[in-house]
């Protein structure tokens, strides 16, 4: 959870998740839909999918017990060198190298490893591994992370408070910028326009389940990316006719919302429509659900916000916006 989510946001979600799935066996026995529903709102759902897949392999290959070997850990979905090292050292107190941004900065500065050196990562990893083997791996690796987080800062490091300052080449030479400083984050610059439809057949809402992409395995109101500006109603009609085999009526603009995923800044335009019959010859997985069923299904955060807007008195969950199209009769 902490790989992409803040500690403050993680703590209550972690406690709830562990309460629901206290061990690998209970997680493996759950359906993917149940796991995604429990993860809802934290984004980066590949993490949840990998956890579920890893739990099933842990039960199948290791009898439900998490392995301590780096090779066995690396064979589990979602576990790379860093996570394997963190599990081995922190959970089992066994020697392991683990290099995150904080440890990279601390050891890079102490050792004088320039960011541009081709084998910098390998050298820092080996230094971390050696240090972890010299004491309690659990304490050493966590101490290095804390040192980077609280003292060896990317800018204006607190060298006077650092227990390693006497051995630090970066301090000796006064060149902190050369030794593995922070990596600039990629700016969110890609603007994306999407259209989404809350399509109703009597008192039921049409949902679809993507088979790929970041929301695969979850449920969403039918959605597609817009190639050009405007023409929302036409895009919705095309979406429902092409992918669900149904021609809608009463299409009108409801509002919009914005959401961000990695470098994509997306404006999602929401329209509503009526369906004359159930979808036929659909190219997507779909289902019709009653309003009360929405709470129990895994929905991405933007879709959960749209679902809330369907409740009486909650229409302000969407931005009415300036881009509106006339209602269609």
What kind of feature is each model-predicted range?
Residues 2-177, 245-247:
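Catalytic cores of DNA base-excision repair glycosylases
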Residues 149-329:
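Intrinsically disordered, low-complexity, charged terminal extensions of DNA damage-control enzymes
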């Amino acid at each position: 959870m902490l790989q992409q989510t803040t500690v403050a946001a993680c703590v209550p979600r972690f406690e709830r998740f562990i309460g629901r799935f206290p061990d690998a066996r209970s997680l493996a026995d759950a359906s993917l839909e149940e796991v995604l529903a429990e993860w809802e709102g934290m984004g980066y759902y590949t993490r949840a999918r990998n956890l579920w897949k890893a739990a099933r392999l842990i039960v199948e290959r290791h009898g439900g017990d998490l392995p301590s070997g780096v090779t066995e850990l690396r064979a589990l979905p979602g576990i790379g060198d860093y996570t394997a090292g963190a599990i081995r050292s922190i959970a089992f107190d066994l020697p392991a190298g683990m290099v995150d941004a904080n440890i990279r900065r601390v050891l890079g500065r102490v050792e004088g490893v320039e960011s541009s050196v081709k084998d910098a990562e390998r050298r820092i990893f080996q230094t971390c591994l050696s240090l972890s083997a010299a004491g309690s791996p659990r304490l050493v690796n966590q101490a290095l992370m804390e040192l980077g987080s609280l003292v060896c800062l990317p800018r204006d490091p607190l060298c006077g408070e650092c227990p390693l300052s006497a051995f630090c080449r970066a301090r000796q030479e006064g060149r902190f910028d050369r030794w593995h400083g922070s990596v600039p984050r990629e700016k969110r610059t890609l603007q994306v326009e999407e259209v989404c439809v809350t399509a109703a057949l009597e008192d039921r809402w049409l949902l679809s389940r993507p088979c790929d992409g970041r929301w695969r395995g979850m449920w969403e109101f039918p959605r597609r990316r817009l190639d050009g500006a405007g023409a929302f109603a036409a895009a919705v009609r095309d979406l429902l006719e092409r992918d669900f085999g149904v021609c809608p009526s009463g299409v009108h603009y409801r509002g919009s919302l914005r959401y961000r995923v990695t470098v994509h800044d997306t404006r999602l335009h929401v329209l509503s429509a009526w369906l004359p019959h159930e979808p036929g010859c659909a190219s997507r997985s779909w289902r019709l659900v009653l309003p009360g069923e929405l709470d129990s299904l895994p929905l991405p955060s933007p879709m959960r916000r749209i679902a809330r807007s369907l409740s009486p008195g909650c229409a302000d969950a969407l931005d009415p916006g300036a881009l509106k199209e006339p209602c269609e009769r």
